[in-house]
Design a protein with these regions (language model features):
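A short pre-motif secondary-structure segment
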Residues: 103-108, 146
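Beta-strand residues that line the small-molecule/cofactor-binding core
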Residues: 45, 147-152
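Generic non-transmembrane alpha-helical segments
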Residues: 93-101, 130, 134-141
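Conserved long alpha-helical elements within nucleotide-processing catalytic cores of c-di-GMP signaling
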Residues: 29-33, 39-62, 69-96, 107-111, ...
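Interfacial "cap-and-anchor" motif at the non-cytosolic start of specific transmembrane alpha-helices
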Residues: 1-24
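A structural signal for short, well-ordered beta-strand segments
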Residues: 63, 114, 150-154
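Catalytic-core segments of nucleotide cyclases and related cyclic-nucleotide turnover enzymes
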Residues: 76, 80, 129-132, 157-200
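Sensory-module boundary signal marking interfaces of small helical input modules
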Residues: 18-21, 71, 196
């Protein structure tokens, strides 16, 4: 009986050690793919998820490229803490807008840039609308209102199929979709600068 108890205790300890090691590894993996300031995925997380999109040949997704307007101005004028707050406000707006899109993902691409992927692409309109709405709501809650604006560009996988030289094989890479979304974000930024003056 003593031998059985000893063996069972040894087994329990071994299982516990394995579980603890697994949890530690999982925690380290989460840290490796998380942006410390925003809690969103970081660039490595985005690259990993985008690689999966390419490998699985997912064909119904949209890329939302987001850039914070005049972050450098905010840093220089109000200090880097204010700039960090601005980044966090945008990240919160993105998180809230992405709720319910369990197949999609979002992350901070670095600096003032964020990338969201909407799956299916039909969700993209509501997501971009909610990002702007969430930002406006956060801004109005600040006293005084905190100046925050973003430029947004959108591109979908499907719009490439007719124009790519590899369209017969249906080969489109996420980097192509991101590049187009980035270009459209810049167009949005230029259009905003022609409008009424604000934090653009």
């Amino acid at each position: 009986l003593l031998l059985v108890i000893t063996l069972f205790t040894s087994y329990v300890i071994k299982v516990k050690d394995i579980l603890q090691k697994s949890l530690r590894e999982k925690h380290l993996e989460i840290l490796a793919y998380t942006d410390n300031l925003t809690g969103l995925g970081n660039r490595q997380f985005l690259q990993r998820k985008l690689n999966i999109l390419d490998l699985t040949r997912e064909k119904d997704y949209a890329v939302i490229f987001i850039d914070i307007n005049k972050l450098k101005y905010a840093n220089d004028t109000f200090g880097h803490e204010a700039g960090d707050q601005l980044i966090q406000m945008v990240a919160t707006a993105i998180k809230e807008a992405m709720e319910g899109n369990s197949d999609g993902f979002a992350g901070r691409n670095g600096g003032d840039e964020f990338i969201c992927v909407a799956i299916p692409s039909s969700r993209v309109s509501s997501i971009t609308k909610n990002i702007r709405y969430n930002l406006e709501r956060q801004r109005n809650q600040q006293r005084p209102p905190f100046p925050v604006g973003v430029s947004i560009g959108v591109a979908t996988y499907r719009e490439f199929l007719a124009g790519t030289s590899d369209s017969a094989r249906g080969i489109v890479y996420s980097s192509q979709v991101i590049k187009l979304a980035d270009e459209r974000m810049y167009e949005d930024k230029m259009a905003q600068r022609k409008g009424p003056g604000d934090m653009r």
